[in-house]
From Swiss-Prot:
Gene3D superfamilies: Aldolase class I
Stated name of the protein: Thiamine-phosphate synthase
Metabolic or biological pathway: Cofactor biosynthesis; thiamine diphosphate biosynthesis; thiamine phosphate from 4-amino-2-methyl-5-diphosphomethylpyrimidine and 4-methyl-5-(2-phosphoethyl)-thiazole: step 1/1
Binding, 4-amino-2-methyl-5-(diphosphooxymethyl)pyrimidine: 37-41, 73, 112, 142
UniProt organism field: Listeria welshimeri serovar 6b (strain ATCC 35897 / DSM 20650 / CCUG 15529 / CIP 8149 / NCTC 11857 / SLCC 5334 / V8)
Annotated residues for binding of 2-[(2R,5Z)-2-carboxy-4-methylthiazol-5(2H)-ylidene]ethyl phosphate: 139-141, 171, 191-192
Family assignment from sequence similarity: Belongs to the thiamine-phosphate synthase family.
Length: 208
């Protein structure tokens, strides 16, 4: 699992500033991303279930072509319906116990955490495969993001003995990735670092 978290790309149609989500995703896959999470939320996102399913299937097909895990954000019904490789939920999304009941043994389960206590609870659950920790730095990609925590939260979680794989998220780019990994993350999640790049593959090469 840790290797799959190395460069974890997250995006939905609302994040794309040039081209289409499938075209940007394929460039990112060619560049070497190790995981993709389809996250359709916020202003500019697809609004109907049928539109989201159609887009999810197109992205899933691309991920399969490049043998990269395809994760769905906060939509258990869709994830189960299309046979996604994983589901990722936040603290305020679908109740994690319900997600575990529905998805454990069928796909990977990721959970966002913002504190040591939330990380400890994720590990106690026994069915969470990895945790997303952040936002580490200020981010423009999530209007409802928690206040940034800096890399210290990663160090605190590791000092607490948490063994779950960790992917850092929030404002991570080529300039600060080394700091995030040194603090204890196994990989990084990025949105705008890729979607707003002039050269997707160059950015990814600098993140690997």
């Amino acid at each position: 699992m840790k290797e799959e978290l190395a460069v974890y790309f997250i995006a939905g149609t609302q994040d794309i500033v040039r081209g289409t989500l499938p075209s940007v995703l394929e460039e990112a896959l060619k560049g070497g991303i190790t995981c993709f999470q389809y996250r359709e939320k916020g202003a500019g996102s697809l609004q109907t279930a049928s539109e989201r399913k159609e887009m999810a299937l197109e992205c899933q097909k691309l991920c399969a072509k490049y043998q990269v895990p395809f994760i769905i954000n906060d939509d258990v019904v869709l994830a189960l319906e299309i046979g996604a490789d994983g589901i990722h939920v936040g603290q305020n999304d679908e109740e994690i116990h319900q997600v575990i009941t529905s998805c454990a043994g069928k796909m990977k389960i990721g959970l966002s955490v913002h504190s040591v206590s939330e990380a400890e609870e994720a590990e106690r659950l026994g069915a969470v495969d990895y945790i997303g920790v952040g936002p580490i730095f200020p981010t423009i990609s999530k209007a409802d993001a928690e206040p940034e925590s800096g890399t210290e939260i990663l160090k605190e979680i590791r000092r607490a003995g948490i063994k779950l794989p960790i992917v850092g998220i929030g404002g991570i780019n080529e300039a600060n990735i080394a700091e995030v990994l040194a603090a204890g993350a196994d990989g990084v999640s990025v949105i705008s670092a890729i979607t707003r790049a002039d050269d997707y593959q160059l950015v990814i090469a600098n993140l690997i």
